[in-house]
């Protein structure tokens, strides 16, 4: 990759020399070294390097002759390497790994517009792994096109097939043996794998999603690393892609995939996690969230929380400045939804120690590691007897974003701090006091500010552990009045005679900002089992602001009153009064000017504290959550009461229906018994009727047979008593039946 000419510092050009007839040098003392063969003279054989080239190579003889010609006849230009074409004029020589002389500047070769190879009169050596030449008279790392072409510098000039080099390799042969998918265990996770030619190959996109997604910017970065590491992944065939889609290893719309062996994946993983895998590359610099370039990242609904007031516009101590820069970096990374790389601390710290000018000029980089490194550097390079440093805004940063540094930490405080300089939260962990229903952006910003406060308080407490308790601490910072139009800090020109070098405590907000006790007694990090975040939320009012300028006379009295105040406030906040303390918390510093001891680095343009505003917002959210919980509880109680009443009504109705059912069953039993009796009586009447019918038939036959009147008279006389008896008996039976029927009708009407 060619570096733009605007970024290259101007180097002194050497006037063109007359042509020299030797091939050992082209401009007096200029020597060209190729990364392919390390010989200044052109070589006839191909270089011993691997990898395809971009175009079909020219014949070796012609390439060598053109290289030799360029080496011999280029006035003021560096000689080309083996198989590479030399530049002419002020453009420098081409890289030795390229077969086409016209591509010399395109593939890591030569200087740019300043004669990186040939314009200098000093010897030039090519960097390892690339054929770019850098002028030794220029110490800038951007004077040669170095880092981006290391993968293409090892190109081969041997005869290759005519197809382009960057075409996709042929996929795996579509055979049943190659298409057999298995789920294997890789670093504790199940990954899809295929066995191709006896080698186990795992799915690269799935492994990227599981292990590399939080380490690099994207899958394209992984492919760039694979090219640099000379690892060629295997291309899946159509059947393997279909199987991987069915397993969920790749997304439904993806129609291509690549496989990689376990060994190559371990190499890739180590390259992604190892900071030393990028030699010569400058550290990445993450911009602040509030910078104009990243303004599109912030949501428009939170202008108050993320206004430039988060970045302190006035004087800070080294600890508070580093903490503010670290918090801005944490917010930036959280808003980008990208985890912080663990190797950033060591890499950036080493980079800042090498380039100390940026740190000493006040360039508080917004990346976490850089802020830690610059804080350490300021602490180490500033003796304790130093008064104060005048902050100088870096040229690349706006004036409002420059973080000035007051007096340094003393050696006791510095020795107590962690090696990286800060106790930084690398991940945004959920907090029990923030409602789950908040938008993600609000939760992220609230967590960032709370971690910011926790970091400042932890550093203050850590510094206090090593300092004597009887020490009188004074601040050398004159706090800027809130209505000051200038964002630059106002520092004292000298120190008072009796003051000691110490870290000015940037305290968090208190429930009574007017109190100005001494800051020599720092609060403990944990008290009564509560974390620092809970105390900073306003649950404990013993977090005190810093001292005033003239507060030295009342030091002892303030010391005793604060001790009594802490003893009063040591009641456990896990009791039900914690809710009342949240409700009764009132931040009284809204309408009045803040005292000088209040942390003015966090002032908004309208004079309000950003921390105070944030805590007020969080308090309002908590109140809303509590009110919602109470309303829901009342609603649940009402619903319970209604359900209970419905249940009682249903129970009464059920009991009534059960009673009615029992009565109906009893009536049914009685009716069935009566029906049986009626059936029996009917059967008896039927039998009696049949008997009478038979007797009547017999009598009629007898009457027909009797001819004489005597016989009829005698028969009549004999039958009369029987007929009378039968009539009386039949009449009695009929009356009984009628009586029973009347009784049945009466009972039926009753029920």
UniProtKB/Swiss-Prot annotation:
GO cellular component: cytoplasm; cytosol; Golgi apparatus; nuclear speck; nucleus; transcription regulator complex
Keyword Nucleus recorded: yes
Compositional bias ranges of the Low complexity kind: 20-53, 61-74, 120-156, 499-517
Location of the region described as Interaction with SIX6 and HDAC3 in the Swiss-Prot/TrEMBL record: 182-377
Tissue expression per record: Expressed at higher levels in adult kidney and lung, and at lower levels in brain and testis. Expressed in embryonal kidneys, eyes, cochleae and limb buds.
Coiled coil: 623-711
Residue span of region Interaction with SIN3A: 620-699
GO biological process, one term: negative regulation of fibroblast proliferation
Comp. bias regions, Gly residues: 75-97, 107-119
Signal peptide segment: none
Complex formation: Interacts with SIX1, SIX6 and EYA3. Interacts with NCOR1 and HDAC3 through its N-terminus. Interacts with SIN3A through its C-terminus. Interacts with SMAD3 and SMAD4.
Name of the protein in question: Dachshund homolog 1
The organism of origin for this protein: Mus musculus
């Amino acid at each position: 990759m060619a570096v733009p000419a605007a970024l290259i510092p101007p180097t002194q050009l050497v006037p063109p020399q007359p042509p020299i007839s030797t091939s050992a040098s082209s401009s007096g003392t200029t020597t060209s070294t190729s990364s392919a063969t390390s010989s200044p003279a052109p070589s006839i054989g191909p270089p011993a390097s691997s990898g395809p080239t971009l175009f079909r190579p020219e014949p070796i003889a012609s390439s060598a002759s053109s290289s030799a010609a360029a080496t011999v006849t280029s006035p003021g230009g560096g000689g080309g390497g083996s198989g590479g074409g030399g530049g002419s004029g002020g453009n420098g020589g081409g890289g030795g790994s390229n077969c086409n002389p016209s591509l010399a500047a395109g593939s890591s070769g030569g200087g740019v517009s300043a004669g990186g190879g040939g314009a200098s009169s000093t010897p030039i050596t090519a960097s390892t792994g690339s054929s770019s030449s850098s002028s030794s008279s220029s110490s800038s790392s951007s004077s040669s096109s170095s880092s981006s072409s290391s993968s293409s510098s090892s190109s081969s000039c041997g005869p290759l097939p005519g197809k382009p080099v960057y075409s996709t390799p042929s996929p795996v042969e579509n055979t049943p043996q190659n298409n057999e998918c298995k789920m294997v265990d890789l670093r504790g996770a199940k990954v899809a794998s295929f066995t191709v030619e006896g080698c186990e190959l795992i799915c690269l996109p799935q492994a990227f999603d599981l292990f590399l997604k939080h380490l690099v910017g994207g899958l394209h970065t992984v492919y760039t690393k694979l090219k640099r590491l000379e690892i060629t992944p295997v291309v899946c065939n159509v059947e393997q892609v279909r199987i991987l889609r069915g397993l969920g290893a790749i997304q439904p719309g993806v129609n291509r995939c690549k496989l990689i062996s376990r060994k190559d994946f371990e190499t890739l993983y180590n390259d992604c996690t190892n900071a030393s895998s990028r030699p010569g590359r400058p550290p990445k610099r993450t911009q602040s969230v509030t910078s104009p370039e990243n303004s599109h990242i912030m949501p428009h609904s939170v202008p108050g929380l993320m206004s430039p007031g988060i970045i302190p516009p006035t004087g800070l101590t080294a600890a508070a400045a580093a903490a503010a820069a670290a918090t801005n970096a944490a917010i930036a990374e959280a808003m980008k939804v990208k985890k912080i790389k663990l190797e950033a601390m060591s890499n950036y710290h080493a980079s800042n120690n090498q380039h100390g000018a940026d740190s000493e000029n006040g360039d508080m980089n917004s990346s976490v590691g850089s802020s830690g490194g610059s804080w350490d550097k300021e602490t180490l390079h500033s003796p304790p007897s130093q008064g104060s440093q005048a902050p100088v805004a870096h040229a690349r940063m706006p004036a409002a974003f420059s973080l000035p540094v007051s007096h340094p930490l003393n050696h006791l405080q510095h020795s107590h701090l962690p090696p990286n300089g800060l106790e930084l939260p690398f991940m945004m962990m959920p907090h029990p006091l923030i409602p789950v229903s908040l938008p993600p952006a609000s939760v992220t910003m609230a967590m960032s500010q709370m971690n910011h406060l926790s970091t400042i308080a932890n550093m203050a407490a850590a510094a206090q552990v090593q300092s004597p308790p009887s020490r009188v601490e004074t601040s050398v910072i004159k706090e800027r009045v809130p209505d000051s139009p200038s964002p630059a800090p106002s520092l004292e020109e000298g120190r008072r005679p009796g003051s000691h070098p110490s870290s000015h405590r940037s305290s968090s907000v208190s429930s009574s900002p007017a109190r100005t006790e001494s800051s020599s007694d720092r609060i403990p990090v944990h008290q009564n089992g509560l974390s620092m975040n809970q105390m900073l939320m306003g649950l404990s009012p013993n977090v005190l602001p810093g001292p005033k300028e003239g507060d030295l006379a009342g030091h002892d009295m303030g010391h005793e009153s604060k001790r009594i105040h802490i003893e009063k406030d040591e009641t456990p906040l896990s009791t039900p009064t914690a809710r009342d303390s949240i409700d009764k918390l009132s931040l009284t510093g809204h309408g009045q000017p803040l005292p000088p001891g209040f942390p003015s680095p966090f002032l908004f343009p309208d004079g309000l504290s950003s921390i105070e505003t944030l805590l007020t917002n969080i308090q309002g959210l908590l109140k809303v959550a509590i009110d919602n919980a109470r309303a829901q509880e009342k609603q649940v109680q009402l619903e319970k009461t209604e359900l209970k009443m419905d249940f009682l009504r249903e129970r009464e109705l059920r009991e009534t229906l059960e009673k009615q059912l029992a009565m109906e069953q009893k009536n049914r039993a009685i009716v069935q018994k009566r029906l049986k009796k009626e059936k029996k009586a009917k059967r008896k009447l039927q039998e009696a009727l049949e008997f009478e019918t038979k007797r009547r038939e017999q009598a009629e036959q007898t009457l027909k047979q009797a001819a004489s009147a005597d016989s009829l008279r005698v028969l009549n006389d004999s039958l009369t008593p029987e007929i009378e008896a039968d009539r009386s008996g039949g009449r009695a039976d009929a009356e009984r039946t009628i009586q029973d029927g009347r009784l049945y009708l009466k009972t039926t009407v009753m029920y």
